[in-house]
Amino acid sequence: MEVYELNFFKRLRKSISVSGGGSKKPKTDTEAINSLSSAYVALETKLNLKSTGRSAILIKRAAVAEFDEMKYEIERFLEAGKADFDLTYRTIVDPYDYLWIIIVSKTIEDNVAAIISIGETIEQKGFSDKLLASIFDFNDGNIAQYLIYNYKLDKFYPFVPVNEQQKRRNHGDELKIMSAIADELPFEKELSKWYPIWNIPV
């Protein structure tokens, strides 16, 4: 299993480098997230937003042995890929009992490949209904700004927290992000569905 997953990661990373993503009407979560591998260029050129190399996938835990086994397989797969892809990872369970798998890598392409690989493993193991969101961290030199992929909506949306304690966000900057890349990837147009995720641990 570990060898298969690592080979899948290598093939996926190669395919992202060649294709560059950019599917505007993706049929799957994989295609949707893959589109970020080219869309991020628009964030850099238009808004000076750069990837920090940090991303995460958020999963609702299930109190069954199969879920723990799946988590162990994902950790083995990521451990095996650390040297080849120059990435690190950690897992945490937050106060709401959600599992976070946090990835740190040198390039956004490796972030995308790792998140896709984890998501597909979760789906293959029968826990697709537990997938909540993937989060990609960007920064303009001042504050963190996030792109969130919601697995229930099958779309991205921006999130720019300003004050975590007061639950304040910068809607103006979020709209700028949407304007910059709405044509580059599947984007949620309904602002009421831009659900905040506070205290993102990336």
Segments from the language model and where they lie:
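Charge-rich, low-complexity segments
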Residues: 2-67, 168-202
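A glycine-rich, hydrophobic loop/mini-helix early in the fold
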Residues: 42-98
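Extended, folded cores of ATP/NTP-driven motor/assembly subunits in large transport
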Residues: 52-58, 104, 108, 131
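Short, flexible loop/turn elements at secondary-structure junctions
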Residues: 63, 105-107, 153
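Short, solvent-exposed secondary-structure capping/transition elements
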Residues: 86-87, 109-114, 123-131
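Extracellular-facing segments of soluble proteins and assemblies that are Gly/Ser/Thr-biased and enriched
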Residues: 89-117
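Helix-rich interaction surfaces within compact, conserved domain-sized segments
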Residues: 123-196
